[in-house]
From Swiss-Prot:
Pfam families to which the protein is assigned, alphabetical: Ribosomal_S19
Organism: Gloeothece citriformis (strain PCC 7424)
Cellular component terms per the entry's GO annotation: cytoplasm; small ribosomal subunit
Family matches, as PROSITE patterns: RIBOSOMAL_S19 (PS00323)
Name recorded for this polypeptide: Small ribosomal subunit protein uS19
Family annotation (Gene3D superfamilies): 30s Ribosomal Protein S19, Chain A
InterPro entries: Ribosomal_uS19 (IPR002222), Ribosomal_uS19_bac-type (IPR005732), Ribosomal_uS19_CS (IPR020934), Ribosomal_uS19_SF (IPR023575)
Protein's job: Protein S19 forms a complex with S13 that binds strongly to the 16S ribosomal RNA.
Record GO terms (molecular function): rRNA binding; structural constituent of ribosome
Length: 92
């Protein structure tokens, strides 16, 4: 079920305040955050946000196509190393 339009998108308060401060100054800095549930809003476009994936912070450059998505969508939490290779010599 989608979020109510009257509520607006969820963005963590600390993240929103940091973005607004950087926009006022006109600076571009990497912003570290653990808030994977925050929605990307148009104010974030052009900034680099380092999103925590459970182990480290993954830097993500925000573009216009990302608006409306969640930050966590762009920082995968699992690493797939491939299925086990079949060893044909062991079968014989």
């Amino acid at each position: 079920m989608a979020r109510s339009l009257k509520k607006g998108p969820f963005v963590a308060d600390h993240l929103l305040s940091k973005i607004e401060k950087l926009n006022e100054k006109g600076e571009k800095q990497v912003i570290k955050t653990w808030s994977r549930a925050s929605t990307i809003i148009p104010d974030m476009v052009g900034h680099t946000i380092a999103v925590h994936n459970g182990k480290q912070h993954v830097p993500i450059f925000i573009s216009e196509q990302m608006v409306g998505h969640k930050l966590g969508e762009f920082a995968p939490t699992r690493t797939f190393r491939g299925h086990a290779k079949s060893d044909k010599k062991a079968r014989r």
